[in-house]
Swiss-Prot record:
<feature type="transmembrane region" description="Helical">
    <location>
        <begin position="99"/>
        <end position="119"/>
    </location>
</feature>
<dbReference type="InterPro" id="IPR011701">
    <property type="entry name" value="MFS"/>
</dbReference>
<keyword id="KW-0997">Cell inner membrane</keyword>
<feature type="topological domain" description="Cytoplasmic">
    <location>
        <begin position="62"/>
        <end position="71"/>
    </location>
</feature>
<dbReference type="InterPro" id="IPR001958">
    <property type="entry name" value="Tet-R_TetA/multi-R_MdtG-like"/>
</dbReference>
<feature type="transmembrane region" description="Helical">
    <location>
        <begin position="299"/>
        <end position="322"/>
    </location>
</feature>
<feature type="transmembrane region" description="Helical">
    <location>
        <begin position="130"/>
        <end position="152"/>
    </location>
</feature>
<feature type="topological domain" description="Cytoplasmic">
    <location>
        <begin position="1"/>
        <end position="6"/>
    </location>
</feature>
<dbReference type="InterPro" id="IPR020846">
    <property type="entry name" value="MFS_dom"/>
</dbReference>
<feature type="topological domain" description="Cytoplasmic">
    <location>
        <begin position="179"/>
        <end position="211"/>
    </location>
</feature>
<keyword id="KW-1003">Cell membrane</keyword>
<dbReference type="GO" id="GO:0005886">
    <property type="term" value="C:plasma membrane"/>
</dbReference>
<dbReference type="GO" id="GO:0046677">
    <property type="term" value="P:response to antibiotic"/>
</dbReference>
<feature type="transmembrane region" description="Helical">
    <location>
        <begin position="72"/>
        <end position="91"/>
    </location>
</feature>
<feature type="topological domain" description="Periplasmic">
    <location>
        <begin position="233"/>
        <end position="243"/>
    </location>
</feature>
<feature type="topological domain" description="Cytoplasmic">
    <location>
        <begin position="266"/>
        <end position="275"/>
    </location>
</feature>
<comment type="similarity">
    <text>Belongs to the major facilitator superfamily. TCR/Tet family.</text>
</comment>
């Protein structure tokens, strides 16, 4: 682990803060250009537009970081984000908001490249720990960002966008002057490697190498959209919670989630292996879903938050397993693909689970959790079956970082 690893964590923290900063004020900014009854539709489209661009372009940018190095792609992404936020800050028409989100989604590769830096600079046995820290950094940024954005929004709905632009400019300077390249692009002079980094064959290779792991990853991310989609609706309906109680619960979940990813995921993976960490995370999440389906008292939600947060150890461990099985010249492509899959669930999940919750609500508001639990049972069985094979035992395959 070197200074570039730590800088990758800082980049992720600041990137998440920038995303979180604008969320509280984006509806207010929209109100300057459109009628109130149209705000929800445009807000949803703007969020979906960013996610859709990430689905399309994150794999390509990840592959470019394999070909040209992590540093130039990071700098490109940070420039794109800075321009996006400045465009939003100075926006005087609706099309400027759409253009800004479009550009940010296209150039937003910081998450994939930061994960690639972790893969480049850490040993196989320590990778889950650092992927956990990466997830925790993003989570803390998403907690701090909306708080800062909420206060800054009291001054002007444009203020948080200036702050977000400043954060990205600062991060750009950090990468420019202190970040050392972690990808040896001289590896790409090998004919086979060079062809792969310049074509889409790398994705075919990844899908052939670990199809079940990618399916498990996508499915787990998709199920994770259930609480993200229905939490406010469910807690208001069953427990009569107001916005303050919902806010407390979400803040508590975010904080606990970061703690588990930072301090628990790596310890479990080191002591008992990545497979155990993945399974324990899925079991914790599925147990939380089972409790949420049946509890009738609001205070019982808070102990369940510990189980939900405990589920946060699964994906860093799974990401570690996949990274260990991936060659060094494919790490950027893998991390870009994972970002793409994650954002795809962010587009599909809210649409799918909002419809399911709405249609099942007249019968019973717990059905959404039972459906999620059923999917988790399938994922757990897949994980136990596939990850018992020797090649999935990442901790036993020490590869050079």
């Amino acid at each position: 682990m070197n200074s570039s690893t730590k800088i990758a964590l800082v980049i992720t923290l600041l990137d998440a803060m920038g995303i979180g900063l604008i969320m509280p004020v984006l509806p207010t900014l929209l109100r300057e250009f459109i009628a109130s009854e149209d705000i929800a539709n445009h807000f949803g489209v703007l969020l979906a537009l960013y996610a859709l661009m990430q689905v399309i372009f994150a794999p390509w940018l990840g592959k470019m970081s394999d070909r040209f190095g992590r540093r130039p792609v990071l700098l490109l992404s940070l420039i794109g984000a800075s321009l996006d936020y400045l465009l939003l800050a100075f926006s005087s028409a609706l099309w400027m908001l759409y253009l800004g989100r479009l550009l940010s989604g296209i150039t937003g590769a910081t998450g994939a490249v930061a994960a690639s830096v972790i893969a480049d600079t850490t040993s196989a046995s320590q990778r889950v720990k650092w992927f956990g820290w990466l997830g925790a950094s993003f989570g803390l940024g998403l907690i701090a960002g909306p708080i800062i954005g909420g206060f800054a929004g009291e001054i002007s709905p444009h203020s948080p966008f200036f702050i977000a632009a400043l954060l990205n400019i600062v991060t750009f300077l950090v990468v420019m002057f202190w970040f050392r390249e972690t990808k040896n692009t001289r590896d790409n002079t090998d004919t086979e490697v060079g062809v792969e980094t310049q074509s889409n064959s790398v994705y075919i290779t990844l899908f052939k190498t670990m199809p079940i792991l990618l399916i498990i990853y996508f499915s787990a991310q998709l199920i994770g959209q259930i609480p993200a989609t229905v939490w406010v609706l469910f807690t208001e309906n069953r427990f009569g919670w107001n916005s303050m109680m919902v806010g407390f619960s979400l803040a508590g979940l975010g904080l606990l989630h970061s703690v588990f990813q930072a301090f628990v995921a790596g310890r479990i993976a080191t002591k008992w292996g990545e497979k155990t960490a993945v399974l324990l995370g899925f079991i914790a999440d599925s147990s939380a879903f089972a409790f949420l389906a049946f509890i009738s008292e609001g205070w019982l939600v808070f102990p369940v938050l510990i189980l939900l947060a405990g589920g946060g150890i699964a994906l860093p461990a799974l990401q570690g397993v996949m990274s260990i099985q991936t060659k060094s010249h494919q790490q950027g492509a893998l991390q870009g693909l994972l970002v793409s899959l994650t954002n795809a669930t962010g587009v599909i999940g809210p649409l799918l689970f909002a419809v399911i919750y709405n249609h099942s609500l007249p019968i019973w508001d717990g059905w959404i959790w039972i459906i999620g639990l059923a999917f988790y049972c399938i994922i757990i069985l897949l994980s136990m079956t596939f990850m018992l094979t020797p090649q999935a035992q990442g901790s036993k395959q020490e590869t050079s970082a």
